[in-house]
């Protein structure tokens, strides 16, 4: 949010070389497009931007509920079951807290769910025009919250599997749709990330690799793990001299160490199962 404010005002005084804020975008450059999205709210609503963002999050919670009902309906559920399904899916969301959360925790799932509804209508044989919905919403979701790409990849896999039902024509149709559904969000994110770095006094960075996030996900959270790795992808990146390639090599090595530990030390299985 602070970066969004800086983008809107043009004041980047806090982003001096080697400051925490400067290092943050070197480590996590994928947050740049998110800041650009939030900048829209600051430019549109000024001092009321954070309230507008909270309202956007609250409305997104309702959009999630509506999308889940529509998806359940398409899967053949009766009206009462649709509502029950949607409510059960939302029980884990503490809406009052997440509505103002500045990582797009509610807007992103609303976008991917409605995009998923469009994908569902498409694979059920409806008009190809239903693809417009995910082709618009999936890129927006990927910009608001990068992890939305996990859902996009899942949607692409679903489209490909469904393509087998239609013979070679259906498969070609499915492959084209899947490529578009993945390529457009990735292209939009990449373009916005380049634009972001063109606007800020921070050198372009490819940041911490995905493998570092995987390693962070399987570590024990202490120095207990192989090699004494404490699980911080931030530290892994900067210990590798802010080099994405070197950080990736270190992360791959760490993942291998954990895997070998699990294979050769049965006591580690307990930790693995807990994870």
What positions do the PLM features span?
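Membrane-interface alpha helices of multi-pass inner-membrane proteins
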Residues: 130-145, 177-185
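Multi-pass, polyprenyl lipid-linked donor-dependent membrane glycosyltransferases
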Residues: 53-60, 84-114, 119, 144-151
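Membrane-proximal stem/loop segments at transmembrane-domain junctions that anchor or position
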Residues: 194-275
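Loop-to-helix entry region of an early transmembrane alpha helix in multi-pass inner-membrane enzymes
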Residues: 28, 32-39, 44-63
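Membrane-proximal lumenal/periplasmic loop motifs of glycosylation machinery
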Residues: 11-35
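Membrane-interface transmembrane helices that cradle and orient dolichyl/undecaprenyl
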Residues: 75-76, 112-131, 160-165
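Specific aromatic-rich, kink-prone transmembrane helix
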Residues: 67-70, 107-124, 134-138, 155
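Transmembrane-helix motifs of polytopic, lipid-linked glycan transferases
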Residues: 55-76, 114
């Amino acid at each position: 949010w602070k970066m969004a404010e800086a983008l809107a005002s043009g004041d980047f005084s806090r982003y001096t070389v080697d400051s925490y804020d400067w290092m943050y975008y070197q480590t996590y450059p994928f947050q740049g497009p998110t800041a650009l999205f939030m900048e829209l709210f600051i430019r549109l609503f000024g001092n009321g931007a954070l309230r507008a963002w909270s309202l956007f999050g609250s409305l997104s919670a309702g959009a999630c509920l509506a999308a889940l009902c529509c998806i359940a309906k398409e899967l053949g559920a009766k009206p009462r079951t649709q509502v029950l399904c949607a409510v059960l899916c939302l029980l884990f969301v503490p809406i009052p807290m997440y509505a103002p959360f500045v990582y797009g925790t509610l807007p992103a799932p609303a976008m991917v769910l409605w995009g998923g509804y469009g994908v569902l209508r498409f694979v059920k044989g409806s008009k190809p025009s239903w693809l417009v919905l995910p082709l618009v919403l999936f890129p927006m979701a990927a910009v608001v919250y990068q992890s939305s790409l996990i859902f996009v990849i899942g949607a692409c896999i679903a489209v490909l599997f469904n393509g087998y039902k239609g013979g070679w024509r259906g498969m070609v149709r499915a492959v084209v749709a899947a490529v578009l559904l993945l390529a457009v969000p990735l292209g939009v994110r990449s373009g916005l990330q380049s634009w972001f770095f063109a606007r800020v006094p921070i050198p372009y960075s490819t940041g911490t690799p995905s493998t570092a996030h995987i390693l962070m996900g399987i570590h024990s959270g202490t120095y207990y793990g192989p090699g004494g790795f404490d699980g911080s992808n931030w530290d892994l990146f900067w210990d590798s001299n802010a080099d994405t390639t070197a950080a990736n090599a270190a992360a791959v090595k760490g993942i291998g160490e954990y895997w070998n530990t699990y294979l050769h030390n049965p006591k580690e299985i307990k930790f693995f199962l807990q994870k």
